[in-house]
Amino acid sequence: YVAGTMGSAHFWLGTAAGRTFIASPMCEVGSVGIMLTYQSFKEYFRKQGIDYREIYPDSADLKNYETRAIEKENNEEPIKQRLAVMHRIFCDAISRNLGIAYDPELPLFRGQIFTGDVAVANGYIDQFGTLEDAVKWVLAQATVRKVNEMYNI
């Protein structure tokens, strides 16, 4: 049930549900993407007279190599490569959960946020409804399951 924003990891989780309900066209869903924020305080520490060092053994030469590439060479590519792998895993899960083919050009898989009406029209959310509607649906599913168990269906 969506009563506000169902974005990113929340969208991933929500699409795994048996049915999704959204309260209003004003609600938002989507944001299938991944990002990383990088900050270095080394220059600040240096200006404060603090000698900040990261020391690695030769046997752990790949430890934190992505951030070290940024610090030493201003090279974001190693991090972008890892993020691309994680993004594809995210997209594949959404694709599987929604039953739609992965298309890297589709705005859904490029991080766009959609209003409730667009999300329902595109099949990203099953239907508009209230929390009560969602609870009734869950109870109905439980009843059907119980009847099926009773009659070995």
Residue ranges and their predicted role:
Residues 1-27, 32-153:
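N-terminal organellar transit peptides
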